[in-house]
């Protein structure tokens, strides 16, 4: 199928959905955090983790952001034993009014392990979170693919979609993805080494970088849909966001964004289109839609060299 044919096909697919619901005329974004209870921190000391979580949640509440946090339950253990303090961090999220989702137990890639192994890991990943949610009167319903990997074949992707439906899960998409974890790894390393100047430089570079990321996503959405779409942003529960989410939220408001729930974002007709992330690439939904329409999504903006240097080997690892 040629590029023009793909593009026409995409438009024809989207027209019925665009006609069935009014598209958002303003910029909206749902915010999600992966790898709870924590990722990229200078220390795993209980006191620090409690303080970091409190600061992050305080920023979310102060900015009126209805976030969802996605849990890797392997991180609830210490030396293979369930750690009450780390479980307590999830309770803090729930008691602050936020929702939790399943990010698998051990952050496996569906592109790299057999489907049955991945499904078992997902179910193991609800052992603690599910009863915690139930005690708060909430339903565990959101699932986020680690690495955004959805399987390398149509058969695996279809079988896993059926598995999710059978277990009451809804996939949480991502349209704004970035190497935020590189900044976070660099920031945590600078903090761990007591280099306050480096941590300040890294933190100061973070929000301007994310502004460029959003500009790219906004343009790609316009190229595909001819309008703004309700975006879904993925971040991580780390010390960088605990210290700088308020500045990130301020930047987004200056760009005209209103924060919405994940449910609200998925009401955008764009998400009803019969296209999604290509799976094997681990791309955002927006990039997947573009590639399937015969377009080449832009590369992420380059991370500043000093940030990459501070991140070290973490800069080579994806989340």
Name every feature range the model reports, one short phrase each.
Residues 1-7:
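Positively charged n-region of N-terminal signal peptides that target proteins for export
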Residues 7-16:
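Bacterial N-terminal signal peptides
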Residues 17-21:
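Sec/Tat signal peptide C-region and signal peptidase I cleavage site
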Residues 22-148, 233, 251:
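Active-site beta->alpha N-cap acidic-glycine motif
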Residues 64-67, 173, 227, 237-319:
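C-terminal domain-boundary segment and adjacent tail
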Residues 82, 108-134, 153-167, 175-227, ...:
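Alpha-helical scaffold elements lining the catalytic groove of polysaccharide deacetylases
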Residues 94-102, 128-135, 196-214, 283-303, ...:
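Short, basic, helix/turn surface patches
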Residues 96-97, 165-170:
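Glycine-enriched alpha-helix->loop->beta-strand junction motifs that scaffold or abut catalytic
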């Amino acid at each position: 199928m040629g590029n023009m044919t793909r593009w026409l096909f995409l438009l024809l697919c989207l027209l019925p959905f665009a006609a069935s619901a009014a598209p958002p005329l303003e910029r909206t974004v749902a915010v999600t955090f992966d790898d709870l209870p924590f990722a990229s921190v200078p220390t795993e000391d209980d006191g620090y983790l409690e303080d970091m979580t409190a600061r992050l949640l305080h920023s979310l509440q102060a900015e009126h952001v209805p976030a969802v946090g996605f849990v890797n339950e392997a991180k609830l253990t210490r030396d293979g034993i369930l750690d009450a303090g780390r479980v307590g961090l999830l309770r803090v999220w729930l008691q602050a009014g936020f929702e939790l989702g399943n990010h698998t137990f051990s952050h496996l890639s569906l592109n790299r392990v057999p489907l049955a192994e991945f499904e078992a890991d997902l179910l193991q990943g609800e052992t603690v979170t599910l009863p915690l949610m139930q005690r708060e009167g909430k339903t565990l319903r959101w699932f986020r693919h680690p690495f955004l990997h959805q399987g390398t074949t149509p058969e695996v992707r279809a079988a896993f979609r059926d598995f999710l439906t059978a277990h009451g899960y809804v996939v949480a998409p991502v349209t704004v993805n970035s190497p935020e974890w590189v900044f976070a790894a660099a920031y945590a390393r600078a903090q761990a080494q007591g280099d306050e100047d480096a941590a300040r430089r890294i933190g100061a570079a973070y929000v301007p970088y994310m502004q460029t990321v959003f500009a790219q996503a906004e343009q790609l959405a316009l190229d595909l849909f001819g309008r703004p779409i309700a975006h879904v942003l993925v971040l991580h529960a780390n010390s960088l966001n605990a210290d700088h989410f308020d500045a990130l939220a301020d930047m987004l408001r200056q760009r005209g964004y209103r924060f919405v729930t994940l449910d609200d974002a998925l009401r955008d007709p764009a998400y009803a289109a019969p296209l999604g992330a290509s799976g094997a690439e681990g791309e955002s939904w927006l990039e997947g839609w573009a590639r399937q329409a015969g377009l080449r999504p832009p590369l992420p903006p380059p991370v500043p060299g000093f940030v990459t240097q501070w991140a070290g080997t973490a800069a080579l690892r994806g989340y």
